């Protein structure tokens, strides 16, 4: 049990969440559960293993068997790349969902980004010149609801990732925090594309003031080649199971995914630890697929604070983050209120002038209207539409991974707004530098 579990501030917090009804991201929390890190920084976790992020781009028709160490007899370069993309995705989960437990002692409530907040950096990969430079751009494109859009790209190896994320949280009667994720990520590797959906999750350990994340439900990785990976998450039960468990199956296409016996490969283990893979119809023993403990994360290179723009996360939240590290509740309240009041005044000024905040590098596209209706709409060959169709994924703003016809997809009045990176806007950027 955490040393904070019996504190009066924690008891008050538990009482407030028990009766809370609304967006939990706006709920105040005691200082010891606050993180000094903004949600805009979470985008970096997608590429903290550059060698795995870029590996699919090095696989071609001539070398795919030698690159696929887990199966030297892999049937095609497309399948070798899908295995590499799956390994990359699994490698992102530890950073995304349990790195704060290791560095901060338990899961913390991140800072709520303000509209227009930015976080940028790069992986220079100096020890691996063949990797080239990988760039991260993250922007808070909406505050109500809170939405973070991001792009990670490596021009040398023609790898591009873009996506956006939004969460909605609620408490169960047992005070377990359930989190629905919204949004998706798209990965382009030269001529192939992959659509990735994040899983739902829940946070346990709240009653004892020692929160930790457990993933649940499913994630999908849909390839433009037709290949599909379905990842099912489970946690430790009262009587059995291990924490952070998953089972992933790779299929020839979404039709085959209806029958688990048709899986080409099955991968199982712990996403925060090790996992093994076995090939269909093979009597050989399973092989090691990935071990999170063996490959340390490579952290993003972010320029010094004095060189950052006022909109950049670490500069904007510097005083608040410092107060959180000190555990000074009064100073946290003072510095946080000052920043938030400044942002409210900006919104009031914009409203008075009849203008709205201009997003810097991302634009929202409406997938529910036609070009004649005057909105920004996707093109006919839109990658997301193609991949969503192959997966039978809902294009509405339903929880990530919602399939067409699911309960969430059938809800009325759902919009279909999705955020897309505009590379030309970054190329024209004058104020923000890496």
Swiss-Prot record:
Effect of residue 109 to A: Strong reduction in cholesterol transport. Abolishes binding to phosphatidylinositol 4-phosphate
Binding site for a 1,2-diacyl-sn-glycero-3-phospho-(1D-myo-inositol 4-phosphate): 24-29, 109-112, 143-144, 336, 340, 344
Effect of residue 340 to A: Abolishes binding to phosphatidylinositol 4-phosphate
Stored Pfam families: Oxysterol_BP
Positions of post-translational Phosphothreonine modification: 370
Binding residue positions for ergosterol: 96
Annotated 25-hydroxycholesterol binding sites: 96
Modified residues (Phosphoserine): 389
InterPro entries in the cross-refs: OSBP_sf, Oxysterol-bd, Oxysterol-bd_CS
Compartments it resides in: Cytoplasm; Golgi apparatus membrane
Chain sites annotated for binding 20-hydroxycholesterol: 96
UniProt similarity note: Belongs to the OSBP family.
Protein name (database record): Oxysterol-binding protein homolog 4
Organism: Saccharomyces cerevisiae (strain ATCC 204508 / S288c) (Baker's yeast)
Gene for this chain: KES1
């Amino acid at each position: 049990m955490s040393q904070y579990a019996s504190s009066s501030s924690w008891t008050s917090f538990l009482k407030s969440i028990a009766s809370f009804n609304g967006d939990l991201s706006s709920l105040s929390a005691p200082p010891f559960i606050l993180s000094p890190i903004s949600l805009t920084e979470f985008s970096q976790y997608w590429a903290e293993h550059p060698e795995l992020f870029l590996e699919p781009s090095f696989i071609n028709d001539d070398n795919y068997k030698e690159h696929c160490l887990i199966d030297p007899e892999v049937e095609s370069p497309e399948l070798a790349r899908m295995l590499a993309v799956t390994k990359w995705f699994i490698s992102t989960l530890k950073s995304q969902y349990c790195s704060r437990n290791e560095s901060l002692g338990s899961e913390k409530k991140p800072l709520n980004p303000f509209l227009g907040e930015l976080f940028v950096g790069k992986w220079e990969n100096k020890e691996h010149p063949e990797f080239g430079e990988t760039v991260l751009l993250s922007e808070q494109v909406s505050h109500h609801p809170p939405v973070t859009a991001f792009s990670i790209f490596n021009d040398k190896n023609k790898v591009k990732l873009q996506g956006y994320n939004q969460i909605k949280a609620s408490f169960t009667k047992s005070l377990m925090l359930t989190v629905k994720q919204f949004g998706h990520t798209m990965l382009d590797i030269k001529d192939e594309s992959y659509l990735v959906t994040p899983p739902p999750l829940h946070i346990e350990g709240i009653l004892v003031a020692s929160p930790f994340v457990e993933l649940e439900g499913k994630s999908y990785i849909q390839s433009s080649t037709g290949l599909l990976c379905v990842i099912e998450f489970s946690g430790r039960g009262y009587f059995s199971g291990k924490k952070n468990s998953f089972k992933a199956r790779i299929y020839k296409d979404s039709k085959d995914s209806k029958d688990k016996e048709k899986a080409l490969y099955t991968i199982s283990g712990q996403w925060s630890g090790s996992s093994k893979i076995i090939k269909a119809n093979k009597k050989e023993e399973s092989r090691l697929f990935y071990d999170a403990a063996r490959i340390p994360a490579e952290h993003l290179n972010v320029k010094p604070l004095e060189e950052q723009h006022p909109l950049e996360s670490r500069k904007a939240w510097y005083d608040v983050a410092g107060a959180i590290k000190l555990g000074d509740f009064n100073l946290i309240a003072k510095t946080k209120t000052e920043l938030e009041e400044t942002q409210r005044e900006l919104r009031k000024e914009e409203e008075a002038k009849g203008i709205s905040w201009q997003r810097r590098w991302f634009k929202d596209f409406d997938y529910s209207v036609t070009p004649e209706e005057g909105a920004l709409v996707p093109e006919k060959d839109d990658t997301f539409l193609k991949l969503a169709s192959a997966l039978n994924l809902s294009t509405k703003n339903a929880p990530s991974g919602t399939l067409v016809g699911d309960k969430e997809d059938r809800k009325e009045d759902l919009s279909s707004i999705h955020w897309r990176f505009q590379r030309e806007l970054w190329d024209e950027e004058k104020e923000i530098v890496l």
